[in-house]
């Protein structure tokens, strides 16, 4: 923006440029219509700074890595690894390195997920052109845009990008496309007269805004603001100040991490004291030795209780959701947003192109002699029928043909089919006129040859009409005028203007834009404004609108059925927004659209109230969109925001989930968003919501599967330190009795990371629950560790503990009794019992995974073989477990011992107990809920 300004220019910089006469603006900026001198421009450049947007760098690589490590559970693991290596140099080095390897793997996964962070500000800079045509020293020259300063006079022509914010003072039929900034669906016809001080951005028709595109005509304007002082710069500033909102899943996982960290710390300290006390009282060791051995036990518990595999499981589940969403035309840029969609309570949608087709379409006609007609068909495809009073018209009347021909001749747009899709070249409004004519047999090219244009008076905002002179038939030449209905009607003598204007009001109430047409015979080759002043015959009205997508109505109905409110936030006019909102079922009964002018007068408390009862917002500016999203979030909503323009980027970033358009969306909006729709269709959002809910259900299944293992391992270790027999062990040359470990830290890591991930993965492929879109969104305040997950965790963990502890003690005592004949050492016997305990936990997980495939139904009801991935996972884990038990390298790493067939059968039977128990639990829960 401005680095430093003298007091006079500073005062001028705060003026509402659009509300003042252009000469006053030039005077306030100490500028003239001939532009600045080179010396004056150089001085101002030193004061104002370059006309560039501030760049704010994203997070560095090291910051991203630190973000993955700075997690309570990760610090527990790192601390455990360090302590293990210090306390027990023999086995502790191996255990510590394995634990650190797990930390590194988790860090790599998280870093890869977040590395492609949004770079929206760089894309904003790309919207500004590199060079501009500027008047310096009274001459037009090409200058780098960065050198523009307030007071420079800029020349604009069709195809130019506006290089800074300009107050226009001279123009000829200038039209500028501002959709990316304002949401206006058609190019804006510019003028030079002042407008109201409180006019919204889209109504400041005497301004040209940086980054917008000139589509027609020429103009001159004086630079009022540059760099971050422009409207584009304000968005840049808002985008830099807007922080990404944490997703419900990330919040929930963080809370789980805190709960687990505190719980693990408390239990580990308790084990440290109990273990040390037992070692000293029953084992006869000193305090230091007892403490050292108890520390190993506490570390083992910490490693066992931490769900190291959970981040990988969550990432895999979300990644599968990404693939499914991509197949449904929603490309996910940020993984956690997959789950967030499932808990969305409000969707704030732009209108143009998302809820509507972004293709202006003539939908109604009015003829002075025969009344109103309806035109069927939407978009630019020239297919549709004519109807009147509810019945189809088989033969198109002559007066209708004359009106449609006038629309085709008095415009410059063309229509053609490219790659199977009908497209226009030119103004969208004129494209609608050409399409309407083509629908009923008026071929544009032939008509324009048969009625060749001889002269044109282009549209001027001061005149509010366009006129064309054409070769006629035997009766001579004719003039056609097209423009604002009231302006056209004043020039006609064959019509009741009040009746026609009532029809204009009726069409406008439906949100349609109305153009009037008139003709008169003429006998001269040239065309002047005086020739167009009177004597016309009123041909009729053509009313058009950017129509709603037909499929969106069903999609919005599905959202309502799923408990999701849909709000339309658009830069378009109030009447159009209200009409579209009512057609789509968005507008609440009796509630009118709220305008940006009204929003600007509200404080935060008023905004929080207005968003409760109103669903349609029109003529909104970027800060209004941002304020509405924040108000909804303050009211406790999980908000999804759709958009395609630069003006949407701050709100996209602020919302819980930003959804950008892939076809019409700017790069700024795409990079600020979490999800990009490849078809720009609202129905894809509904499909993505359904997929998000399925992902969340499957994450709950994964949590219900993983957490019992961690709690069970903790219970096993707690039971062991309190009740297991002590074993003889040589420490520093002295025979003492030491605590008996049912599992080693490395074995616990095997269960948690390798085996658990292998079995939890199939749960991510489970089909959606039957009621997925017939229930309200999940309360964002509801913890992931809800009553169901907690109860299921304790139930399953208790069963797992009983099986693993029972079989460990059975195998240990059985082998100890037969050690004389077996020849096994006590260390080998302990290793065999530990291997059997691990295998029992693995078999428990195999059968428990089958139970977790559905939240409410038995595995036999949903179909045992309905998810083939389950059995791929089972096969993989059994193969890995066989290597764990019998492969010499694995035996060396994990200190395992080969098991007999009898031991394997017993482990499988103990694990299978969970299947009938959980089936009964589901049955009881379903009956109590009914």
What are these regions (language model features)?
Residues 1-777, 784-785, 798, 838, ...:
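Conserved cytosolic headpiece of P-type ATPases
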Residues 90, 792-807, 843:
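Alpha-helical transmembrane segments of multi-pass integral membrane proteins
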Residues 271, 764, 801-813:
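Transmembrane alpha-helix/helix-exit interface in multi-pass inner-membrane proteins
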Residues 722-743, 810-833:
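Helix-coil boundary and interhelical linker segments in multi-pass alpha-helical membrane proteins
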Residues 755, 834-849:
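Generic alpha-helical transmembrane segments
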Residues 780-798, 826-836:
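Membrane-water interface at loop-to-transmembrane-helix junctions
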Residues 852:
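A C-terminal functional module that forms or caps the active site or interfaces directly
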């Amino acid at each position: 923006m401005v680095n430093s300004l003298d007091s006079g220019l500073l005062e001028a910089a705060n003026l509402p440029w659009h509300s003042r006469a252009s000469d006053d603006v030039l005077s306030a900026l100490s500028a003239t219509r001939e532009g600045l001198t080179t010396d004056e421009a150089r001085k101002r450049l030193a004061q104002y700074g370059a006309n560039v947007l501030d760049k704010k760098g994203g997070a560095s690589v090291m910051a991203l890595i630190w973000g993955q490590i700075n997690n309570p559970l990760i610090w527990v693991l790192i601390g455990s690894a360090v302590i293990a290596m210090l306390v027990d140099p023999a086995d502790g080095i191996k255990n510590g390195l394995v634990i650190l390897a797990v930390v590194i793997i988790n860090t790599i996964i998280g870093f890869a997920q977040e590395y492609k962070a949004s770079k929206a500000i760089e894309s904003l800079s790309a919207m500004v052109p590199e060079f501009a045509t500027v008047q310096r020293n009274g001459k037009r020259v090409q200058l780098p845009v960065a050198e523009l300063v307030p007071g420079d006079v800029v020349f604009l022509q069709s195809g130019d990008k506006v290089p800074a914010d300009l107050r226009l003072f001279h123009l000829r039929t200038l039209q500028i496309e501002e959709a990316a900034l304002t949401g206006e669906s058609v190019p804006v016809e510019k003028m030079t007269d002042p407008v109201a001080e409180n006019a919204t951005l889209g109504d400041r028709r005497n301004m040209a805004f940086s980054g917008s595109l000139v589509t027609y005509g020429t103009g001159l304007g004086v630079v009022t603001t540059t760099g971050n002082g422009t409207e584009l710069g304000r968005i840049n500033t808002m985008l830099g100040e807007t922080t990404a909102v944490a997703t419900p899943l990330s919040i929930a996982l963080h809370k789980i991490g805190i709960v687990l960290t505190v719980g693990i710390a408390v239990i580990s300290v308790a084990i440290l004291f109990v273990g040390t006390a037992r070692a000293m009282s029953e084992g006869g060791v000193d305090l230091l030795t007892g403490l050292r051995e108890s520390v190993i036990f506490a570390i083992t518990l910490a490693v066992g209780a931490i769900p190291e595999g959970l981040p990988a499981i969550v990432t895999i589940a979300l990644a599968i959701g990404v693939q499914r969403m991509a197949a449904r035309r929603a490309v996910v840029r940020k993984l956690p947003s997959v789950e967030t969609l499932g808990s969305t309570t409000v969707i704030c949608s732009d209108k143009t192109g998302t809820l509507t087709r972004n293709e202006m379409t003539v939908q109604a006609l009015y003829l002075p002699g025969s009344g109103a007609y309806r035109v069927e068909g939407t978009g630019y495809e020239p297919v549709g029928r004519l109807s009147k009073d509810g019945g189809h018209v088989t033969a198109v009347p002559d007066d209708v043909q004359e009106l449609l021909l006038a629309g085709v001749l008095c415009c410059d747009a063309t229509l053609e089919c490219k790659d199977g899709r009908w497209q226009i070249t030119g103004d969208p409004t004129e494209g609608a006129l050409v399409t309407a004519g083509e629908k009923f047999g008026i071929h544009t090219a032939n008509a324009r040859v048969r009625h060749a244009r001889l002269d044109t008076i282009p549209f001027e905002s001061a005149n509010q009409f366009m006129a064309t002179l054409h070769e006629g038939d035997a009766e001579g030449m004719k003039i056609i005028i097209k423009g604002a209905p009231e302006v056209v009607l004043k020039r006609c003598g064959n019509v009741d203007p009040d009746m026609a204007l009532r029809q204009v009001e009726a069409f406008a109430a439906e949100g349609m834009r109305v153009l009037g047409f008139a003709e008169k015979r003429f006998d001269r080759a040239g065309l002047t404004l005086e020739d167009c002043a009177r004597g016309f015959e009123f041909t009729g009205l053509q009313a058009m609108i950017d129509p709603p997508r037909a499929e969106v109505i069903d999609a919005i109905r599905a959202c309502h059925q799923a408990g999701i409110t849909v709000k339309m936030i658009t830069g378009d006019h109030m009447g159009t927004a209200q009409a579209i909102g009512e057609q789509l079922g968005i507008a609440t009964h009796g509630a009118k659209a709220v305008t940006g002018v009204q929003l600007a007068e509200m404080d935060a408390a008023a905004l929080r109230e207005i968003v409760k009862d109103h669903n349609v917002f029109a003529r909104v500016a970027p800060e209004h969109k941002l304020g509405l999203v924040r108000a909804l979030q303050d009211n406790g909503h999980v908000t999804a925001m759709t958009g395609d323009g630069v003006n949407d980027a701050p709100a996209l970033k602020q919302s819980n989930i930003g959804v950008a358009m892939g076809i019409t969306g700017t790069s700024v909006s795409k990079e600020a968003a979490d999800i990009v729709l490849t078809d720009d269709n609202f129905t894809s959002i509904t499909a993505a919501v359904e997929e998000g809910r399925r992902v969340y259900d499957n994450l709950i299944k994964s949590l219900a599967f993983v957490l019992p293992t961690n709690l069970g391992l903790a219970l096993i270790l707690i039971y062991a330190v309190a009740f297991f027999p002590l074993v003889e062990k040589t420490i520093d040359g002295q025979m003492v009795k030491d605590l008996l470990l049912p599992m080693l830290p490395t074995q616990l890591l095997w269960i948690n990371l390798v085996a658990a991930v292998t079995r939890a993965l199939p749960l991510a492929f489970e089909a959606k629950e039957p009621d997925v879109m017939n229930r309200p969104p999940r309360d964002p305040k509801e913890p992931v560790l809800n009553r169901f997950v907690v109860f299921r965790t304790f139930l399953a963990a208790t069963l797992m503990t009983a099986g693993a502890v029972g079989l460990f003690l059975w195998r240990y005592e059985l082998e100890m009794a037969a050690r004389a004949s077996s020849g096994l050492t006590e260390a080998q016997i302990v290793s065999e019992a530990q291997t059997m305990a691990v295998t029992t936990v693995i078999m428990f997980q195999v059968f428990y995974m089958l139970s977790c495939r559905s939240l409410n139904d038995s595995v036999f009801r949903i179909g045992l073989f309905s998810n083939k991935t389950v059995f791929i996972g089972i096969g993989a884990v059994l193969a890995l477990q066989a290597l764990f038990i019998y492969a010499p390298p694995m035996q060396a790493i994990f200190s395992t011992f080969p098991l007999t067939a009898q031991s394997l059968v017993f482990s499988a039977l103990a694990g299978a107990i969970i299947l009938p128990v959980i089936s009964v639990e589901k049955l009881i829960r379903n009956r109590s809920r009914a």
